[in-house]
Amino acid sequence: MKRICSIYRSPKRNEMYLYVLKSDVLKRVPPELLVAFGKPVHAFDLVLSPERALSREDINVVLENLDSQGYHLQMPPAEDDYIEHLPEELLRRNDPM
């Protein structure tokens, strides 16, 4: 079950991506989602299959969402994930003495 997918990034939120079937373009994405997402910026096209690994998403969930609803929305990582990667010095900077 291979799918050719177009991936768009959101101009409103860093690291938010919208996966759609290339043949459908954005036709099946609800208008309300497009308003919240912002004007989609094409990032790249990708062939998806169950054997392919994605860095932050479960490939089976992405493929299921593409088949059932016509799109998959990848949310940005939680802000806590960003904080964990900061140096200890920055994490402690505002702590009371």
Curated annotation (Swiss-Prot):
InterPro entries for this protein: YcgL-like_sf, YcgL_dom
Gene3D superfamilies found in the cross-reference section: YcgL domain
HAMAP family noted in UniProt: UPF0745
Domain YcgL, first and last residues per copy: 3-87
Pfam families cross-referenced by the UniProt entry: YcgL (PF05166)
Domain of life (superkingdom): Bacteria
Name under which the protein is recorded: YcgL domain-containing protein PSPPH_1548
